[in-house]
Amino acid sequence: MLNNNYIALIMEINNCEGLSFLTWDMFDSPDLPNSGYKFMEREPVILLDNIIKRYRIIIKVVLGYVSKPYADKLRLVRSNSHRVGKAVKIRCVGTKKRLTLVRGLVQQGVHRIGVSNDYV
């Protein structure tokens, strides 16, 4: 039987796996712990981590992966990219910071970017 400290250590290692600044739990569905690590696509998260490393900006991930019950609660359509872990909603206040983030996303080859006053 595994020790609780060992399990916590493994979860902590997984939480940062492949990332420099972000952690996988930032992308968890609010109702399902560790879902960000299990269900998020690796590519968008790693791209975002590279942008943060390059431009030294701080972001707040508002929405990453969402489970079916949580998506139903938010009334997200069945084909919503958050349901399959391919989308990230980021709170980004300030024109300069927002433009820096969008520029970084475009330079990394992202084609689908939604921008509003406070979110990317």
Predicted regions span which residues?
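Long, low-complexity, intrinsically disordered polar/charged segments
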Residues: 3, 10, 24-25, 31, ...
